[in-house]
């Protein structure tokens, strides 16, 4: 069983000064308010109510931390970080300013952050705000993995087109950098449970979870007799 299934709520942060003073790796989840971010986190962790999904898009304007650790372990081995959804028009100007500052400062300056899972609706990838998030994060030199959510809403050919175009945009970003990080993408559907294992492997690798390490094959050489 994936250690992600053991994820538990840890804390909510509304100011950078309140970020946990920890040293373990973190994986952040970002996306527009209607991209299915909370639902995807819940299904990756095989839980129904881990990440809260507000009935009003854009309502959640703080950062939620979830620990990843074996049962009864004294300390976490990593954190999943649910960032505020962005792009909802009805959020007030002052709240939006604070919220965007919190987002940009966290993704640009958090040294514990190992990678960014960026969720985009497969029907509308790379909106202006999605591009802004990528451009905030790229200078860190850390990887981005795009989940094209709600893939069940598209035909097979439209999904293939969306994935191809997304990978091209990522390749264009990489071409502008001297030493680009890994910029990858996949199709994802919480409803159809599509792409879950692929996304779990990415997150587990970034958190250096034991499940991400290849199994060590036993030696075929018999033990040398002692004495």
Swiss-Prot record:
SUPFAM superfamilies in the record: P-loop containing nucleoside triphosphate hydrolases
Homology family: Belongs to the TRAFAC class TrmE-Era-EngA-EngB-Septin-like GTPase superfamily. EngB GTPase family.
Functional description taken from the UniProt entry: Necessary for normal cell division and for the maintenance of normal septation.
Residues reported in the UniProt entry to bind Mg(2+): 38, 60
Source organism of the structure: Cupriavidus metallidurans (strain ATCC 43123 / DSM 2839 / NBRC 102507 / CH34)
Needed co-factor(s): Mg(2+)
Binding site for GTP: 31-38, 58-62, 82-85, 149-152, 185-190
Domain EngB-type G residue range list: 23-209
PANTHER family: ENGB-TYPE G DOMAIN-CONTAINING PROTEIN, MSS1/TRME-RELATED GTP-BINDING PROTEIN
The entry's keywords: Cell cycle, Cell division, GTP-binding, Magnesium, Metal-binding, Nucleotide-binding, Septation
One record GO biological process: division septum assembly
Pfam family, one: MMR_HSR1
Protein name: Probable GTP-binding protein EngB
Molecular-function annotations in GO: GTP binding; metal ion binding
GO cellular component: cytosol
Domain of life according to the entry: Bacteria
PROSITE patterns: G_ENGB
């Amino acid at each position: 069983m994936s250690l992600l299934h053991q994820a538990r709520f840890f804390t909510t942060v509304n100011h950078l000064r309140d970020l946990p003073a920890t040293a373990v790796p973190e994986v952040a989840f970002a996306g527009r308010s209607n991209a299915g971010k909370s639902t995807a986190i819940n299904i990756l962790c095989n839980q129904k109510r881990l990440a809260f999904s507000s009935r009003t898009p854009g309502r959640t304007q703080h950062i939620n931390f979830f620990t990843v650790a074996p049962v009864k372990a004294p300390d976490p081995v990593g954190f999943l970080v649910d960032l505020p959804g962005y792009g909802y028009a009805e959020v007030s100007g002052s709240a939006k300013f604070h919220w965007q500052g919190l987002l940009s400062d966290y993704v640009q300056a958090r040294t514990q952050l190992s990678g960014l899972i960026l969720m985009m609706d497969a029907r509308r990838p790379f909106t202006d705000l999605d591009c802004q998030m990528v451009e905030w994060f790229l200078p860190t030199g850390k990887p981005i993995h795009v989940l094209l959510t709600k893939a069940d809403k598209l035909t097979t050919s439209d999904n293939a087109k969306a994935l191809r175009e997304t990978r091209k945009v990522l390749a264009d970003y990489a071409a502008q950098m001297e030493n680009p990080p890994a910029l990858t993408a996949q199709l994802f559907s919480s409803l159809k449970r599509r792409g879950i294992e692929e996304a779990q492997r990415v997150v587990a690798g970034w958190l250096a979870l034991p499940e991400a390490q290849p199994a060590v094959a036993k030696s075929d050489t018999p033990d040398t007799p002692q004495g």
